[in-house]
A protein has these predicted regions:
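Class I SAM-dependent methyltransferase Rossmann-like catalytic core
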Residues: 2-20
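Conserved alpha-helix/loop element of class I SAM-dependent methyltransferases that forms part
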Residues: 17-36
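Class I SAM-dependent methyltransferase SAM/SAH-binding core
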Residues: 39, 45-47, 51-95
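A short acidic, Gly/Pro-enriched loop at the edge of an enzyme's catalytic core
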Residues: 97-106
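A short SAM/SAH-binding and catalytic strip from SAM-dependent methyltransferases
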Residues: 105-118
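A short glycine-rich, Lys/Arg-flanked "PGG" loop and its adjoining helix->strand segment in the class I
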Residues: 120-134
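Conserved class I S-adenosyl-L-methionine
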Residues: 136-160
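Core SAM-dependent methyltransferase catalytic element
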Residues: 177-192
Length: 192
């Protein structure tokens, strides 16, 4: 059984890209360099995959349940000469990521914590991260109307996400101000 999340359909790529200044967001969430591998839960069009791959010394493992999204990311990896991108079709909600425990320096969970089992997803991210590894989370804000995103009723608040992140074992949870680059989103960072 597929675990495609509720209200997870993607809009047109150009419209989707209009919601984010991805380079600025990735600078704030990832930094200018990641030493090691990055895992991306739900890569979509690769909006965040490409800038992340440019900043990491290791691989970016970009996972999505939708084959057409993975194909899009693979094509971008070729177009932008990013051989460190490994895009795979994977139902990580139902089956986990399939990567070794402690093998990742950074885990990205962007626009996914409205799914039915957010703590399970966060625990899988925790499992993949090396000691001291970083989790970055962004999600659609629930306190304002937005032009896209899941219904307001199922969007988690930053406070809910912080509690879930802590329940999954993370510490040093901090807010990241994304208003200049992703005005419809909030950001959080945490450490394993």
């Amino acid at each position: 059984m597929s675990m495609k999340g509720r209200e997870s359909g993607m809009p047109d790529e150009a419209y989707w890209a209009s919601f984010f200044e991805t380079e600025i967001a990735i600078d704030k969430l990832i930094g200018t360099a990641v030493l090691g591998n990055v895992i991306e839960f739900g890569c979509g069009y690769g909006s965040f995959t490409v800038p992340t791959a440019r900043r990491t010394t290791g691989r970016v493992i970009a996972l999505d349940i939708e084959p057409e999204m993975v194909d899009c990311v693979r094509q971008k990896a070729v177009t932008f000469d990013l051989p460190n991108v490994q895009a795979d079709v994977r139902d990580f909600v139902a089956h986990g990521t399939g990567v070794d425990s402690g093998s990742q320096a950074h885990a990205m969970i962007f626009n996914l914590l409205h799914l039915e089992q957010p703590i399970s997803l966060l625990r899988e991210a925790y499992r993949t991260l090396q000691e001291g590894g970083v989790l970055s989370v962004i999600h659609w804000r629930s306190d304002i109307p937005t032009p896209r995103g899941p219904s307001l009723e199922i969007r988690p608040t930053p406070e809910q996400c912080r509690a879930w992140i802590a329940d999954a074992g993370f510490h040093s949870i901090a807010s990241v101000d994304l208003q200049d680059c992703c005005p419809f989103h909030f950001g959080l960072l945490a450490r394993r």
